[in-house]
Amino acid sequence: QINNAWPSMIWHLYDFYLRPAGGYFGAKRSMEALHPLYGYDDHSIWLVSSHYEDAKGLKLTTKIYNLDMTEKFTQENSADAPADSTAKIFTLPDVAGLSPTYFLALKLQDSTGKVVGSNFYWLSTKQEVLDWAKTNWWMTPTATYADFTALSQLPKVKLNVSERTERKGEESITHVTIENPSKSLAFFVRLKVAKGAKGEEILPVIWEDNYISLLPGEKREVTATYRAAELGTAKPVVEATGWNVE
């Protein structure tokens, strides 16, 4: 992967080899048609709809976890999302006993229970403070930073990963099931499809989702789509790495 060129924002999305980066999936997540989000300024929880039709009977589940995955807060809210709307659902209360680094998980379900939107945040009890006195024409420096050093203390986890691949015309689609059987968070898990065991990564590739964080016991299914010709005679092999993945 090459260093970011200017403008840096574009190169946070994908690199010269069309390898999608974490920023790509963050942007993709934010453009969900129904999207729950957290307001950093006032700790509010919002629901955004980009649909042109009303969505009724939604359920939003909000949970806060300490670094050790102790659940510190949970709340369920029923909501309707009018077409092309933004609505504040509620404001998080002050939660006692939070670890310096903690996590916020948002899950939005439709009336059938299907997950239609989600979001996951790692947050700090120490707020970032901007140094407004040193603002210039292109930036404002940070005086003090949020504290995420505790992320380095996350226990190592071993994931269960399985895959199957199907051919559709000139494309191959690899279906990946990834599960976190541990009692710890699997943080920022990156999946890649390689040309055989320890082979080169297949690029370009379109992942349904990636750079995933899995709560204890959580299982996810995602797909990767790429040109079948990229495989040659090799068998596709999925590899999972991550912040604290063995």
What residues fall within each predicted segment?
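Carbohydrate-binding surfaces of carbohydrate-active enzymes
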Residues: 1-209, 215-224, 233-238
